[in-house]
């Protein structure tokens, strides 16, 4: 009977009689959840509208805290918990990865990920669960930045995970405290009561240490606090955080014989503390450096993609140099302008990434270099 099936999927928490939680290992729940994720992807598996998907959703706040596997006691841990926990995480991350093929996927990292508790010492299997999610195509995020409690905050274990995966997958930050309602002044960091800017500074400092690619300012009063109490930190992240890519040296000829191949060179730096995650499976190295020959109307008449120039490797402001030989330049004789860009190879090699340069750009997004005469 359908009603009996629904009851099998749910259990009721004693303290919150109106709250229900599924048993995520229940095959009936999984069957219907798979339909839900498939329908969700039909709407949101589109990078034009979706930046990323939090692809776990189990436990408190969907962050993998206090995940229940026992319908009679939601906090129960037995000899099967670790096995079931891993099987569920593997199932749900593969499920999202199957349907979200174009949009990055994200999971929270913390010391009791997927466990029937929300605090305590690090579970010995949590590190391997994070690695499993990443192997299934995930990025990582923490929603406890600025919380320094060793039992439930962003502490030594979480910092070690961030360091382990630095420049391999992007990390997303969200602050743990809601400064308008949480007693943040009890934090071990010594935040002063009535000084939310202390919390913002703590979150920012941990974000810089973790080399986060994105700072999530949450919503409502939290966002207002970032702008009203710590706007200088917002400005710093805009200029320092994530990736900041630019070519600091480009060598192109000013004379080209029609039909000839041309050698060009470029040197790139990433001045941000994060990295450009071109290696994400959903992106699959689709962003590449390209050169263009632009006509008098600012239209790219020829585009040459340097497939060996890989932006995901550019980190820590180090210079990365490349030399590239173009295919034959088969354009009519005349004056053109060299352009350079990072293009999306899945969208007809159109410029896709804003470069951190002040040079003039075409409407299409090509950074203009200098004129070239084709003879």
Task: Label each residue range with its predicted role.
Residues 19, 23, 34, 68-70, ...:
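Structured domain cores in non-transmembrane regions
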Residues 1-14:
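Single conserved hydrophobic/aromatic residue that forms the stacking wall/gate
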Residues 6-9, 52-57:
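Glycine-rich, aromatic-flanked loop segments that form ligand/cofactor-binding clefts
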Residues 54-62, 67-221:
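Catalytic-core regions of glycoside hydrolase
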Residues 7, 49, 211, 332-336:
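Short loop/turn motifs at secondary-structure junctions
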Residues 199-252:
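Catalytic cores of secreted or luminal carbohydrate-active enzymes
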């Amino acid at each position: 009977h359908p009603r009996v099936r629904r009851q099998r999927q749910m259990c009721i928490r004693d303290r919150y009689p109106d709250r229900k939680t599924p048993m995520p290992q229940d095959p009936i729940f999984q069957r219907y959840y798979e339909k839900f994720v498939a329908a969700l992807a039909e709407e949101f598996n589109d990078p034009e509208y979706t930046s990323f998907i939090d692809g776990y959703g189990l436990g408190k706040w969907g962050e993998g805290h206090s995940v229940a596997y026992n319908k009679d006691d939601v906090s129960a841990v037995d000899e099967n918990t670790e096995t079931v926990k891993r099987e569920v995480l593997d199932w749900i991350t593969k499920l999202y990865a199957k349907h979200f093929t174009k949009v990055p996927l994200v999971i929270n990292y913390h010391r009791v990920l997927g466990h029937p508790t929300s605090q305590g010492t690090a579970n010995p299997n949590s590190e391997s669960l994070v690695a499993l999610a990443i192997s299934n195509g995930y990025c990582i995020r923490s929603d406890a930045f600025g919380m320094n409690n060793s039992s439930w905050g962003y502490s030594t274990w979480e910092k070690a995970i961030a360091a382990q995966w630095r420049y391999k997958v992007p990390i997303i930050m969200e602050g743990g405290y809601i400064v308008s309602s949480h007693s943040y002044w009890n934090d071990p960091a010594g935040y002063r009561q009535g000084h939310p800017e202390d919390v913002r500074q703590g979150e920012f400092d941990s974000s810089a240490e973790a080399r986060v690619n994105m700072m999530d300012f949450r919503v409502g009063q939290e966002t207002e606090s970032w702008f009203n109490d710590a706007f200088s930190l917002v400005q710093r992240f805009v200029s320092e955080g994530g990736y900041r890519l630019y070519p600091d040296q480009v060598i192109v000829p000013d004379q080209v014989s029609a039909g000839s191949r041309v050698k060009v060179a470029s040197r790139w730096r990433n001045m941000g503390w994060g990295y450009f995650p071109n290696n994400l499976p959903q992106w699959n190295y689709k962003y590449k450096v390209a050169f263009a020959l632009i006509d008098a109307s600012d239209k790219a008449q020829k585009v040459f993609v340097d497939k060996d120039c890989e932006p995901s490797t550019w980190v820590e402001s180090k210079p990365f140099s490349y030399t590239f030989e173009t295919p034959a330049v088969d354009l009519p004789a005349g004056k053109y302008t060299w352009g350079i860009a990072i293009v999306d190879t899945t969208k007809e090699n159109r410029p896709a990434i804003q470069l951190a340069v002040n040079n003039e750009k075409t409407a299409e997004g090509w950074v203009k270099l200098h004129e070239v005469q084709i003879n």
